[in-house]
Regions:
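The −1 position to Zn-ligating cysteines in a subset of zinc-ribbon hairpins
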Residues: 542, 682, 697, 729, ...
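Short metal-coordination and nucleic-acid-contact micro-motifs, chiefly zinc-binding Cys/His arrays
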Residues: 676-680, 722-726, 821
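Extended, highly charged accessory segments
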Residues: 231-234, 413, 455, 462-532, ...
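Short Cys/His-rich Zn2+-coordinating modules
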Residues: 660-671, 706-716, 806-812
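Short helix-coil boundary/hinge micro-motifs
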Residues: 670-682, 689
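Cys/His-coordinated zinc-binding microdomains
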Residues: 687, 734, 829-832
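Histidine-centered nuclease catalytic patch
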Residues: 687-728, 739
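Helicase motor core with emphasis on the C-terminal RecA-like subdomain
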Residues: 4, 8-51, 55-62, 68-163, ...
Length: 856
């Protein structure tokens, strides 16, 4: 059955109808053609005519004309609109007319490079031109690499290979860099956050090397490189700031082409919200089970379908569900495959070919297939969960109907706040994308890493800038103090014996890693940033790798090794940590009405103090364990909002919370005395000494009752009363803290909402942001929420949050008001029984009262 005939059945199905929150029909659109640009080599139109392309689409002609006129050009049109031809035409024109000219193509994934290789080779074959084209990445056989270095005129690679495998060895590529005429950068919306900040610095290094070989910088005069010979051709999905983003990446003006001339087929987009299985707790049926139910119907009816999952594990799980569902339906001739990172290259190529040829009917993929690899004409795309940005969602939806035919895209929401906001606010999705791609190439941690690489590649001249970074000389002095470079005359030379590119991953801000090793044999099974390791790799933790559970037996923090052993267990572990923020510098701050808001440089101090064992599926707490790890400090940028005293007093007067006295356990007197002695018998907030005849109070940083101590049943008081969780306060400061502490359920609910809604506006992943709730923050003296960039040094997210605060607060109130749960749930203020957030059963009411007071 065709999709055209299947959709009316879907519309009439009462079970599906009850789940649908939006059904949008996007009408078909005819093509808009243009004439071939006059300046284009006439051999190209003839070759394309032989392949059935008589005229270019309007955006292809416009982009070609701009590029041939010498403009760096950016094409921003939808998926499958022919962006490839828009950059291939000028590149082939230049290479046809200059036998020494070369072109570099950068793609974010290996699969995209392989896909474009075939497209270029087919066109060059029709042209009968001598233009060798090759892919050069980690999968390229070593036996072929010398031939590619010496002979390729078009090189297809990825930023990681350019960074570590090409630029440091530029002397072997001298002919290529001498003739470099064009740099193509596809899918630039992917280059955001930490990854994009790294890539911008890799491009700075590329410009230095091209300038060196092309003589763009006077070697004796030390003039700044002009790099006039290379034209940049860029392509992007729709984002809010394409020109700004492109110009930050290449540090040069770009000309924008955004009016799409390609035809589009009719597309139906369905938003589906799984039914509630527990209305009070706000729990919904798994979106994987929903995808299995409706996806199996599509496949059984002959609709070739791609399913997108958020992780490798959920992709494998959904693949199993679909195969089982088809078997229950008695459908045995439908082939469904998986596609994700970790599959061998030849296996991925075979799956792509099977999809193109129709031998494979369905594929379950991670975002590895989100980008423009040619997988043929799919009828439907099913998104199991929001991929993080509207741009990515449209990319995934665009995998169906790529050749202008009728298609379906179905978004099936998960139970989290981000998914629920999208599925309940379809206008937000279908309206203009609010997302900005943000990078910070001058993040000092990232920049210094690439400055080392650049110095290794070529000496710096006195007065030479590294891109638009204005303090290159000062940064080189810092490296000299570390013994990594030295100044001789007017040059700075690399003197270290290290290979700096090998120590820098483009996917993380910090080069410092923890290696994960099997206890038997010492085989490395993975690695992790040092910043994120403590809550996941502490001793006693259950670490999951490729769906397999490992017990962490030993963490050697100094050496950077975690030793693990495979185990079969029915529980997971969750770390218990204490964190606090120190504001190092305030860049902007406003105190108006109910809120003080600000942003600046912060230090986030964190220490993992314990963990709990949580049974899978039921989430029952099975027990606790202690951890002794050093404090970690993340220096980054943060945004904060703090409640005014009158807001706190009004909520306190409303009696929206209660506070029962605690039994602090048998070791409380001893631990209390130790804490007072450690703090010098002074209040840690105001510095006041203990008055005669009266002792100061001792406060639990993480509230005592969240540790689940039950006298006679467990000894969880030991974790709660560890000195790391205690601080000495005078009576006045303690009252202020406790006043804020009783608000903490509302504050935590609001922080959870802001943390989940912010990525929609920032075009980042929730994991790019961290957050803290402080009942009485030292830098504001008030109950405070802090959201911070998790990349060392920050990448610009906090500053944008400061500007977005009004919209975010309104969106948060709307979200919690509309949620149908009783007390709070993952779709609004977070799970009501989770760890430090479980300070009040009715966190939802507290959060809503707090938002109403703020926005009154």
């Amino acid at each position: 059955m065709s999709l055209v005939h299947l959709l009316p059945r879907f519309q009439a199905d009462p079970n599906l109808h009850a789940r649908i929150t939006a059904w949008e029909r996007i009408p078909a659109r005819p093509p808009v053609y243009a004439a071939w640009p006059d300046a284009l080599d006439p051999r190209l139109p003839l070759a394309l005519a032989a392949r059935g392309i008589a005229r270019p689409y309007s955006h292809q002609a416009q982009a070609t004309e701009l590029a041939l006129a010498g403009h760096h050009t950016l094409v921003v049109t939808p998926t499958a609109s022919g962006k490839t031809l828009a950059y291939n035409l000028p590149v082939l024109h230049w290479l046809l007319n200059d036998p020494d000219a070369r072109a570099l193509y950068l793609f974010p994934t290996k699969a995209l490079a392989q896909d474009q290789l075939q497209t270029l080779q087919d066109l060059i074959e029709v042209l009968q031109a001598d233009i060798p084209v090759a892919v050069y990445d980690g999968d390229t056989p070593k036996a072929h690499r010398k031939r590619i270095r010496e002979g390729a005129r078009i090189l297809l690679t990825n930023p990681d290979m350019l960074h570590a495998g090409i630029l440091p060895h530029h002397t072997a590529w001298n002919a290529f860099f001498r003739g470099l005429r064009a740099v193509v950068i596809d899918e630039i919306h992917i280059y955001r956050g930490v990854f994009g900040s790294h890539v911008a610095n890799v491009l700075r290094r590329l410009r230095r090397i091209a300038d060196f070989y092309q003589g763009a910088t006077g070697l004796e005069s030390g003039e700044r490189a002009s790099h006039l010979n290379v034209t940049y051709l860029l392509a992007s999905a729709t984002i809010a700031n394409p020109v700004e983003h492109a110009e930050r990446l290449i540090e040069a003006p770009v000309a924008l082409v955004a009016r799409n001339g390609a035809p589009t087929g009719e597309k139906h987009v369905i938003f589906l919200n799984p039914p509630l299985v527990d209305r009070d707790l706000g729990l919904r049926r798994s979106n994987l089970l929903e995808a299995q139910q409706w996806g199996a119907t599509l496949l059984a009816e002959g609709v070739q379908t791609i399913f997108f999952a958020r992780s490798r594990m959920t992709a494998e799980l959904l693949l199993t569900y679909l195969r089982e569902g088809l078997e229950r339906k008695g459908v045995r001739d439908v082939v469904v495959r998986g596609y994700r990172g970790g599959y061998l290259p030849r296996e991925r190529r075979a799956i792509e070919r099977g999809l193109r040829e129709g031998a494979i009917h369905g594929v379950v993929a991670t975002n590895a297939l989100e980008l423009g690899v040619d997988i043929g004409q799919l009828g439907a795309a099913v998104l199991t969960g929001f991929p993080g940005t509207i741009a990515s969602a449209w990319q995934q939806a665009g995998r169906a109907g790529r050749r202008g035919d009728f298609s379906l895209a179905m978004f099936i929401a998960g139970g989290g706040a981000l998914d629920q906001y999208i599925v309940q606010h379809p206008d937000f999705f279908f309206g203009r994308s609010p997302e900005h791609a943000r990078i910070n190439p001058d993040n000092l941690v990232i920049l210094l890493a690439h400055l080392r690489c650049a110095a290794f590649e070529l000496p710096f001249r006195t007065g030479e800038d590294f891109g638009r970074f204005q303090f290159t000389e000062e940064a080189l002095v810092m490296l000299a103090e570390e013994g990594e470079v030295m100044q001789a005359g007017d040059r700075w030379f690399w003197t270290s014996e290290s290979y700096p590119a090998g120590e820098v991953s483009l996917r993380t801000a910090s080069p410092d890693r923890i290696l994960i090793l099997e206890a038997d044999g010492g085989e490395t099974i993975g690695e992790m940033d040092r910043e994120t390791a403590p809550p996941l790799l502490h001793e006693g933790a259950i670490y999951l790798h490729e769906g397999r559970a490992y017990l962490v037996e030993h963490l050697d923090w100094e050496e950077g090794h975690a030793w693990v052993r495979p185990v079969e267990v029915d529980y997971a572990t969750r770390a218990i940590s204490a964190s606090q923020a120190d504001v190092l510098a305030v860049h902007d701050q406003k105190d108006a009405g109910p809120l003080l808001r600000g942003w600046g440089e912060v230090a986030i101090r964190s220490r993992v103090t314990g963990f709990k064992r949580v049974k899978r599926w039921t989430h029952e707490v099975l027990g606790y364990g202690e951890v002794d790890l050093p404090e970690t400090v993340l220096e980054t940028t943060g945004y904060w909002l703090a409640l005014a005293d009158d807001v706190v007093d009004a909520l306190r007067a409303a009696r929206l919370w209660t506070s029962a006295p605690n039994d602090y356990g048998p070791n409380w007197p001893e631990q209390r005395a130790k804490a007072r002695a450690r703090d010098g018998y002074r209040c840690v907030l105001c510095g006041a000494s203990e008055p005669p005849g009266r002792t100061h109070d001792v406060h639990h940083i993480r509230p005592f009752r969240t540790f689940g101590y039950i006298p006679g049943v467990n000894e969880n008081y030991r974790l709660a009363n560890r000195l790391e969780n205690l601080r000495t306060l005078c009576r006045t400061c303690h009252q202020k803290v406790e006043r804020g502490q009783r608000l903490r359920s509302g504050l935590s609910g609001l922080a959870y909402l802001l943390h989940n809604l912010a990525p929609l506006h920032l075009m980042c992943d929730p994991s790019d942001l961290g957050y803290l709730v402080e009942p009485l923050a030292p830098h504001t003296g008030r109950p405070t929420i802090i959201l911070y960039d998790r990349a060392p040094g920050g990448i610009g997210l906090s500053e944008r949050l400061y500007d977005l605060q009004p919209q975010l607060l309104e969106a948060a109130r709307e979200m919690v008001s509309a949620c149908g749960c009783s007390h709070g749930c993952p779709a609004c203020v977070g799970p009501v029984t989770e760890g430090a957030e479980a300070l009040d059963w009715d966190a939802k009411a507290l959060t809503l009262a707090l938002l109403n007071a703020i926005l009154a």
